[in-house]
Each structure stands twice: as structure tokens, then as C-alpha cells.
């Protein structure tokens, strides 16, 4: 995932000294690591590595010690695109990538710049892109629907590779023998049911893909092939259905499955020793092993790979130094734990993920006292071993987190979904502070890493204990299991001796509530433990979900059930709690759901729950099933006031939803989405020091970016504060407990922070920046200061080096909006974007467009149509200039992202001023019409090619 913007370059025009981290714009903070899909070492420069990750595309120039994002010119769900990344072995600066909408991209400068080749496939059709060794410009696509495709023009076009591959069978992996590039092996993606027509899993070609023959089959279906590696002496190794297979004749026939416990049924990656035929490295769910007898037996190589609960990182990529084994260096890509390096042929490992921002952070909490300022960040949605919980330290509010480390000693979790600090235990410092974390442990078959998903630390996160006594058990051997535990709250008056009123000052607190998937009883068709309660600080738990609807028609396709997600507690009367639920049902079997779902309230400490959802939007055709409630927030000063977010998850892309508000304890709800353009709100947060200040984060995509929103009036109106934020926004929010101007967000690329600067008109440009604009801060010369006009924003242009520059070096531009239809009175996130960040904009003459003043980006709230003037102070645009737009040609469609001519909707009305006509849901806006907002990015540009005929 790439950041949506490059820089807000105006802050230094009015500030002296170094800027605080995230001042006025979102800044990446770490922690680092995460899912690695592809990993390559440059054959020409072994210190250069490339990684395709869930967080995007990264390069290292120092052997993996540090990593830098390399995405200039890329767009289209790059976290997905990391699956399809390749390097040209003969031209090591040439890379290819298939983005999330199926477009082939190429870089010829080591990833510094990317451009489309012009070829595309359907979204998610490409599982792998493979360079053909022995020549430049030849590569292959491994597809879901069309077998193996081959290109001889560096990705500009592809054709079918040859005959013999089964029609309609998805392929997942292709390996080419570097010693004989005509010999190739293709593996299928896997099938989980009987398919007697297609039982072969690996296909061999000895003529460069002109023809194929099946060489490895099963009794009744094709299996899943995740890796194939050619070795010395005709040996080939393959990971097939999580098992190891070996061929002694170059893939013509196979032996297997090989190996016994613990590596059977756990293998994802193989890498043959290029010099020793019987030696192979084996990676998978149990870490890394090496076999020296052709896969008959193996030895674990997990020193340094243990990440949590005694479990090693799951290895899905094994990369060797080009001169291995003379240079005994190896790198590993893992499922959830980033990249590891060994200088000793795997004898020991060290993490090498600094800068690799691909951690999926779903939970945040902060501790502060005079000696310690610490952030806890939980890794979400992991089903393989991950660090699970990180702790970071900084020098104080707004300063960068200079160090992150796992905080998971004895923590039996693979993922963390909530972190809660007991405030009554803070007085003794971090070392005696009690923390709770919830999430999920290892799934089956990781029998040695299963527990109930609730954890407690008595020493500030230094060590952890699982606290799941009383939870239902399953499995063999039995272990506590209630699925994912998503949220946990504390009763603030549940200490041993509570005061007459108000929260306890000393603790620890004893009454805890949590929400989880719960336990389904197949015999009775009932669910329990969706709400959990403990009265002894987590030492034991009881089910507390009476009144939460039981499944309907539990044994039929018409089954309906509810999942309990958020929970909040009334701090003034802790007997009162609220939960939000999400409905599960088969839309193909039911015309409309009938189960009660939405918000429920308990007034007796969770003993009973009552439906409390009047006014929340319902599923189509339903009277009782509200849209999915994914977050809740309560006003600590007035607990009758709550907010919730609802999303229609039954529709792909969460096409409808928003924020709702109640002032009577949930008896009635009304929409509170004024200013919210995102429909998929995943987090709500009330600033505890200013309960009228709220934050919300909305998910999105590159072509319809998500945002973080702020309301200063209790949710009556919202505005975006999203400059620099990743396109898919955030799933966790945290206000700094010392300085509420500092806000943190958890995303799929780690933690991001922003230090909010005064911005009276909420247009995204700090007041001090607008006050320094031309004409004494009146950039549009209308007699009113720009800093006081929500529809006017003035700031300096972006700089090439990414550093803020004074106005003497980077002159100002001004955005001013005139409504045509709709209110169109509020500009948001007005910013400058460095044009080259989007890659080359190539004219019809083959040369690049030049952007002397870079790009202007802004969003207009509550708007159907508007005129926008862009005044670039001091500029003089000749007749050779036109207006260019970067964004989707079809609003919201990532497949149409790119550079476009916008001159038909733009007029130059003065030497330095352009006037744009913009319409909601039309060309020139990222947003689809349903957003009722216009998001534009573009600027004046000139192609030198227009002068070639001798005319201006």
C-alpha cells in the first residue's frame, strides 16, 4: 500500500527548527515486518534485495538491514500486488509487477520508477510473474484461468505458452531450470474436492512451454503447489499440499510425500542447494529445516526464528546469495514476521525488517508517566506465528518512535485485537502496570499454540499469562476456544474498595467484559460465550450473553446468527453496557434476514441484553436486522450519548454505511455522517480529555481512498484529516494521553501519526501556512483571510526531495471553490503532491509531461458541482500548457487509475490561473457518486513534443 500523498511542503515556510514527527501530515512510525509474498536478491549486486509485501513494494541496498518503499508510478492495491513481483536475472535493475487490478508494470531502474507495459489481466487472475533466465525481456504469467502465458517483449503482450495444460485449472507456481531454461515445471493451485478429470498437480515442459505433460498426480484431485526448486544432479524439490516431494530426473517422475513430524503437512517453501544434490532447505509453518538426504529426514534451523509462544515464524520464501554456498548467506520471507537473515547457512537467524512497513496493526494503547512514554501495538488478523504485540518508546508526544520491540514473552497469541490498560495500577510505573490483551492463538494444527485468546500482564507487558479458565474447550488435546476475542473493557468501580462515587483510584480492577466469536453447540443449536464476564480480574470467565439472539434454523441453509464485535461500558454506571453485532446469513438462501442484529444494551452488568437499535439502517427487506455495527463509542461525561458505525458487509466493498448517534442511551439513533465520504468506518474514538472531539477512520482503496475524520462538535459535522495517510486508512485510533493534538492510527502498513496544527477552517492547511500566503494571507484576493475560509486553501508546492521548503524556493498556489450545485463550502485535505511520485506521464510524442508547479489535490465536501480556481502565484503558463489529472477515469474504479488529459474541463483564465469544472461522480473525481464529494488531483503540464513542428 502506498501513501496517497507525497508531502505537505508548506509547514517550514512559517516554522523554524526541525518539525515534529507527523506535524500537519501523517507519518509512518513502524513497527516493521509483516507478510512477505515475494523476496529476491539481485544477482548483479547481492546487497540489493526486493520484497513484495502486504504493505507494498520495498527495496534494500544493504543486504536487508534497512528497507525503503519503492512505488513511484504504481497504483492499484499494491499489498495484493506483492504476490506478483519478479526480477530480471540478466538485467537486475528490471522488475515486473502485476498490480491488484491485473495491470503489468515494469521498472528499469531498480524500482525507483514504474510504468504500465500496456498489458492487463482480470483482477486477481495472476498468481505469479516469472522471469525466463538466459535472456532479457522474456517472462511468464501464471494465471487462474488461462494457464501459463509468455511474453517476449518485456511484458507488453502475452500469448498462451503451449498445449498440454488442463483447461480451466488454476495454476499457482512456475519454476524454470536455470541450467536449461527450456525445462519448466508448472504447479496447480489446489483443489479441496474430488475432480477425477484433473488429477495432475505438476506439469513438465522440456521445450520452453510449447508442450506440457503431467508428471505428479493424486488419486482423485489436483493438489496445491506452493514452491518448486531445481537443484544439482537432476534433483527437483516441490512443496505440494504442504508436503515435500522429490524428483531425481528433472521433474519427469516424483517420490513423496517425504519427511515425518514435525515438517509433514506444514511445508510452503523449498530451496535446493545448488552444489549438493541431496541437500534442500524446507520452509513452512514450523519454521525452517534442512535435509541432507534428499528429504528423507531433516534438522530444524530455527535459532533466532522463534517469534511467539515458542513457535517459529512461518517461512514461505527462501533466498540464497547468488554465490551460495561459497557465500553462506540466506534470507527468509515469512507469513507474518517479516524478513530474516543468516550469514551461517541457516545455523542462526536475525530479523532484518527495519523500514519494511507491512505490519497489520489492529489495536493501540498508550502508557505515559514522567519516565516512560510507550505505545503498545497489536498485530491483527494473523493465523500464523507473528510477534503479535509490539512496544515502542519515544521521548514524548509528537516525537518519533525510535525503537520497537516485541512485547510477547509467554504471550500465546498469533494476533491481538484489543489492548486495555488498568488505570488503577499505573501509579507504580510501567513495571507494575496491569495490561490485558485479547486476540487469538494458533489455529489447528498448531496444537501446541492454542488457548482462549485472553492474556494478562502484571509488569507492563514484560511478561504475559493466558487467562482462559472457564471458557469452553475443543480439540484433542482439548484447549479453550471461543474463536477471536475482539474487545475487552474494565468496570472502573470494581476494585476491592470502590469510592462512594466515581472510578477507583487504586486497584486492580476485578470485573472485566470481553466479546468473541463464542461457542456453538451443535447438539442444541445454541451459541454462548459471545459476551464473556470475569469478576476476579480474569482468573475465570462465564458466559454473559443472555438476550443476544440465538441462531435461527441452525441446521439449515437458512441459518442466521450474530457475531458480537464492539463493547463499551458506562463509566458512571458500570452496570450499563452496550455491544454491537454483525449478522451472518446466506443471502442466496434468504430473501431477507429476520434475526435481531445491531446494538444491544445491558443494565444489569451483562446478565441480560435488550435490542436497542431503533433508527439504525436495516438490511434490504428486513425489519430487525440492522447493518453490521463495527465500532461503538460512548461519551464519558454524558453516557446517554453514544456513536456507532454501521457497514453493509453483505455487499462487496461495503457500499453503504456511516455513523449514527444517540442521546438517549440507544433508544433512538439518527445519522451523524455529515462530512463523511467513506462508507466503511472501522474505528470510532472519543478524546477522553475533550469528549466533544471525536475521530473516525474509514477504509478505502487507491481509487476511492479512505480517511481519518475529526469532529469538534460531537459528531454533528466531520472533516477529513488525511494528508499522507495510506489509501486504505486505518482500523485503530489512539489519542496521545499527554498531548491530544497527536493522533495515532493503526493500518496494514503499521502505525502512523499526525501532530495536528491549528487549522481554523479545517481545509487541511495549517493556519500559519495560510497566513503566510501572498497578499498578506489572502491568496485569492477577495479581502478575507484564507485561513478563515473553508472553501479557500493556500500553500506551497511540493518539493522534489520530500522536504518542506520555504516560499522563496517553492511558491504558493491557491485553491478557491465556487458552488454550482450542493453546498460545496468545505475544502478538505488541500495539499500539493509531487507529480513524479505517480510515475512518468508520457505524451503522445513519447516524451514526459513537465509539471513546473507539481499537482494540487483537494476534496470538496457535500458537493454536486463546483467551479474551482487554481492560482499558481508568480507562474506564467504559455499556450503549450494543458491541465492534467491523475486519478481514476471512472470514479472509484482502480483499473482506470492513471494520467489523463483534463483540458476539456479546464480553462486558463489568466497567465497564472486555471478554472476547473468538477462534478460529483464524474471524470475528474476519485469518488463515486454515492460519496457526495469530489476529490481531484492534477496540475498544469507541458510536453516538449508540442514544439517539434515549430509552432507554439
Predicted ranges, named:
Residues 28-42, 71-88, 118-132, 164-177, ...:
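Short coil-to-beta transitions that initiate beta-strands within beta-rich domains
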Amino acid at each position: 500500500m502506498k501513501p496517497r500523498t507525497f508531502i505537505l511542503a508548506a509547514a517550514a515556510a512559517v516554522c523554524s527548527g526541525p518539525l515534529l514527527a507527523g506535524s500537519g501530515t501523517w507519518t509512518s512510525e513502524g513497527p516493521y515486518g509483516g507478510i512477505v509474498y515475494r523476496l529476491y536478491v539481485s544477482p548483479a549486486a547481492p546487497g540489493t534485495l526486493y520484497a513484495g509485501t502486504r504493505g507494498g513494494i520495498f527495496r534494500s541496498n544493504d543486504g536487508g538491514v534497512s528497507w525503503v518503499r519503492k512505488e513511484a508510478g504504481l497504483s492499484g492495491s499494491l499489498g495484493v500486488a506483492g504476490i506478483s513481483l519478479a526480477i530480471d536475472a540478466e538485467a537486475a535493475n528490471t522488475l515486473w509487477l502485476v498490480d491488484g487490478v491485473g495491470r503489468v508494470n515494469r521498472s528499469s531502474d531498480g524500482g525507483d520508477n514504474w510504468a504500465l507495459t500496456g498489458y492487463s489481466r482480470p483482477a486477481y487472475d495472476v498468481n505469479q510473474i516469472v522471469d525466463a533466465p538466459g535472456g532479457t525481456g522474456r517472462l511468464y504469467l501464471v494465471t487462474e484461468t488461462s494457464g501459463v502465458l509468455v511474453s517476449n517483449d518485456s511484458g507488453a503482450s502475452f500469448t498462451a505458452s503451449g498445449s498440454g495444460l488442463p483447461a480451466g485449472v488454476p495454476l499457482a507456481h512456475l519454476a524454470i531450470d536455470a541450467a536449461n531454461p527450456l525445462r519448466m515445471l508448472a504447479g496447480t493451485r489446489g483443489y479441496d474436492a474430488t475432480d477425477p478429470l484433473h488429477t495432475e498437480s505438476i506439469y513438465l515442459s522440456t521445450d520452453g512451454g510449447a508442450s506440457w505433460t503431467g508428471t505428479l498426480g493424486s488419486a482423485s484431485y489436483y493438489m496445491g503447489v506452493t514452491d518448486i526448486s531445481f537443484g544439482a544432479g537432476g534433483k527437483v524439490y516441490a512443496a505440494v499440499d504442504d508436503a515435500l516431494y522429490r524428483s531425481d530426473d528433472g521433474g519427469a517422475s516424483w517420490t513423496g510425500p517425504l519427511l515425518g513430524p514435525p515438517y509433514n503437512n506444514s511445508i510452503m517453501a523449498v530451496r535446493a542447494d545448488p552444489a549438493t544434490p541431496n541437500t534442500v532447505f524446507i520452509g513452512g509453518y514450523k519454521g525452517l529445516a534442512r535435509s541432507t538426504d534428499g528429504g528423507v529426514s531433516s534438522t530444524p534451523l530455527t535459532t533466532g526464528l522463534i517469534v511467539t509462544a515458542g513457535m517459529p515464524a512461518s517461512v514461505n520464501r527462501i533466498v540464497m546469495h547468488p554465490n551460495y554456498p561459497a557465500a553462506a548467506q540466506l534470507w527468509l520471507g515469512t507469513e507474518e514476521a517479516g524478513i530474516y537473515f543468516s550469514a551461517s547457512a541457516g545455523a542462526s537467524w536475525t530479523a532484518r525488517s527495519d523500514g519494511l512497513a507491512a505490519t497489520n496493526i489492529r489495536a493501540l494503547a498508550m502508557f505515559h508517566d514522567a519516565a516512560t512514554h510507550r505505545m503498545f501495538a497489536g498485530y491483527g488478523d494473523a493465523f500464523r506465528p507473528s510477534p503479535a504485540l509490539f512496544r515502542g518508546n519515544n521521548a514524548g508526544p509528537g516525537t518519533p518512535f525510535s525503537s520497537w520491540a516485541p512485547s510477547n514473552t509467554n504471550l500465546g497469541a498469533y494476533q491481538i485485537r484489543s489492548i486495555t490498560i488498568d488505570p488503577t495500577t499505573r501509579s507504580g510505573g510501567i513495571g507494575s502496570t496491569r495490561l490485558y490483551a485479547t486476540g487469538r492463538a494458533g489455529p489447528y494444527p498448531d496444537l501446541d499454540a492454542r488457548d482462549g485468546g485472553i492474556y494478562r500482564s502484571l509488569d507492563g507487558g514484560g511478561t504475559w499469562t493466558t487467562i482462559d479458565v472457564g471458557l469452553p474447550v475443543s480439540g484433542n488435546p482439548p484447549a479453550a476456544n471461543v474463536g477471536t476475542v475482539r474487545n475487552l473493557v474494565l468496570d472502573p468501580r470494581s476494585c476491592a474498595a470502590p469510592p462512594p462515587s466515581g472510578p477507583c483510584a487504586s486497584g486492580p480492577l476485578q470485573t472485566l467484559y470481553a466479546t468473541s466469536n463464542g461457542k456453538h453447540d451443535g447438539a442444541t443449536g445454541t451459541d454462548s460465550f459471545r459476551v464473556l464476564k470475569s469478576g476476579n480480574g480474569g482468573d475465570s470467565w462465564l458466559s454473559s450473553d443472555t438476550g443476544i439472539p440465538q441462531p435461527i434454523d441452525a441446521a439449515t441453509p437458512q441459518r442466521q446468527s450474530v457475531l458480537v464485535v464492539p463493547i463499551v461500558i458506562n463509566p458512571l454506571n458500570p452496570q450499563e453496557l452496550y455491544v454491537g453485532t454483525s449478522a451472518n446469513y446466506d443471502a442466496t438462501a434468504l430473501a431477507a434476514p429476520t434475526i435481531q442484529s445491531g446494538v444491544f444494551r445491558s443494565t444489569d452488568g451483562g446478565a441480560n441484553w435488550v435490542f436497542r437499535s431503533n433508527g439504525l439502517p436495516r438490511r434490504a427487506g428486513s425489519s430487525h436486522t440492522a447493518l453490521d455495527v463495527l465500532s461503538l463509542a460512548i461519551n464519558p461525561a454524558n453516557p446517554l450519548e453514544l456513536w456507532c458505525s454501521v457497514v453493509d458487509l453483505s455487499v462487496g466493498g461495503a457500499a453503504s454505511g456511516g455513523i449514527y448517534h444517540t442521546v438517549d442511551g440507544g433508544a433512538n439513533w439518527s445519522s451523524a455522517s455529515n462530512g463523511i465520504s467513506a462508507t466503511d468506518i472501522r474505528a470510532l474514538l472519543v478524546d477522553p480529555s475533550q469528549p466533544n472531539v471525536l475521530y473516525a477512520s474509514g477504509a478505502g482503496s487507491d481509487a476511492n481512498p479512505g480517511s481519518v475524520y475529526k469532529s469538534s462538535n460531537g459528531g454533528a459535522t466531520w472533516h477529513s484529516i488525511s494528508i499522507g495517510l495510506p489509501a486504505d486508512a486505518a482500523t485503530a485510533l489512539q489519542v496521545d494521553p499527554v498531548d491530544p493534538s497527536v493522533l495515532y492510527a493503526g493500518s496494514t502498513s503499521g502505525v502512523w501519526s499526525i501532530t495536528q496544527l491549528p487549522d481554523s477552517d479545517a481545509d487541511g492547511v495549517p493556519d500559519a501556512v495560510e497566513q503566510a500566503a501572498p497578499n498578506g494571507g489572502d491568496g485569492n484576493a477577495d479581502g478575507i483571510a484564507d485561513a478563515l475560509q473553508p472553501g479557500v486553501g493556500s500553500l506551497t508546492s511540493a518539493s522534489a526531495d520530500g522536504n518542506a521548503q520555504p516560499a522563496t524556493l517553492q511558491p504558493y498556489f491557491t485553491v478557491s471553490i465556487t458552488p454550482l450545485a450542493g453546498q460545496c463550502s468545505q475544502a478538505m485535505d488541500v495539499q500539493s503532491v509531487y507529480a513524479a511520485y505517480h510515475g512518468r506521464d508520457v505524451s503522445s510524442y513519447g516524451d514526459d509531461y513537465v509539471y513546473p508547479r507539481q499537482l494540487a489535490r483537494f476534496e470538496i465536501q457535500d458537493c454536486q458541482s463546483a467551479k474551482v480556481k487554481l492560482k499558481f502565484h508568480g507562474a506564467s503558463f504559455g499556450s503549450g500548457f494543458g491541465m492534467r489529472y491523475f486519478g481514476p477515469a471512472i470514479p472509484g474504479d482502480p483499473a482506470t487509475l492513471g494520467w489523463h488529459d483534463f483540458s476539456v474541463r479546464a480553462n486558463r483564465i489568466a497567465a497564472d490561473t486555471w478554472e476547473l469544472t468538477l462534478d460529483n461522480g464524474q471524470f475528474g473525481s476519485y469518488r463515486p457518486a454515492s460519496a457526495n464529494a469530489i476529490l481531484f488531483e492534477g496540475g498544469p503540464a507541458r510536453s516538449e513534443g508540442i514544439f517539434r513542428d515549430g509552432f507554439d
